Amino acid sequence: MKSSLKRVITALLAAVMLAAIPCVPAFGAQEYYVNDGENTLALADAYAIGADGSTAKLPERGVYAATASGTQLLGGSEYDDEQPNIPNGIVRVGLAFGSTALDAVHLQIKTGSGFAFGYYDSDRVFQSVGSTAESAVTVIADTNVTVGDSAFGAYHVQLGDTYASFDAAQAAANSCGGYPVYYNGSYRVRIGSYRSADDAPAGQGTVVSGGARCVLVVKAGTEQILFGFDCGSTRSLSLAPQNGSGAAITQVAECKERNGSRSCTYYGDFQFTRLSTQEPQKLTLVNFVGLEPYVKGVTPYEMSSGWPLEALKAQAVCARSYAACKIAPSASYDVVD
């Protein structure tokens, strides 16, 4: 009977140790069973037996080992069994930041069509402020910068009117060859892109330069500016790829160049933050994605599909647990790519 119990306790200890992983609530079966050779007994509680025959009940929140001197607590007597707080279920994945910040970011939707322009609020809820039907765009800082064969300037002509909606600003922009700008909660229209104020014609409006955090969305491979986002340091531009039939998948060209053969396609949305004036052309890039799509996307890169199914399941649990435990509301991102 004692040897049978020891074998059972070994299995129970493994289950208890799994239950002690922080941040991830674990729940075992309501009953454990042991066969003593004659009867099947239901054990409502788990016990460990030491070499001297002493026994100790194993609480749900403890990890114990049976030793020659009795049962010893290994750790994990307390853990937070509350569900981790993931605002709106969104994980922020840092793709480019610090020394890896980018001069420009090229996005190409692989599944879906068009982007919504907007920003994420403090609850990680996307607030839309405009859109485009283009499926390939480039995001740049509003400064003097060259991207491929296209040159952009920091100066523009701004019309005098303020518009209450994106549609109204877009209509005005279409009539004068300009583009709408979301400016601290309202809309303006700007025209052109000039390297200096002297180069900009002032006949249609006032010559202005964007703020220190202003960014532009450009039609990929052209000098056509689609949208400007100029809200200072309080908000960062986010682009939400659109796909009416399901989750959009987007390729980030710069990540593909950096990682070679890796496809660098992502679920979710993308946030762009312009760095300080020390490097005014640089942009950080953060992927905003739901926890489950994040796990679905990251697991194949960490473990190939040739692994046993149970191993893949375990890897998915690890990826989910790690992301859930790394949520950092006060930081710029939670995990890195």
Regions found by a protein language model. Give the residues of each.
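Conserved, single-site charged/polar hotspot
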Residues: 2-337
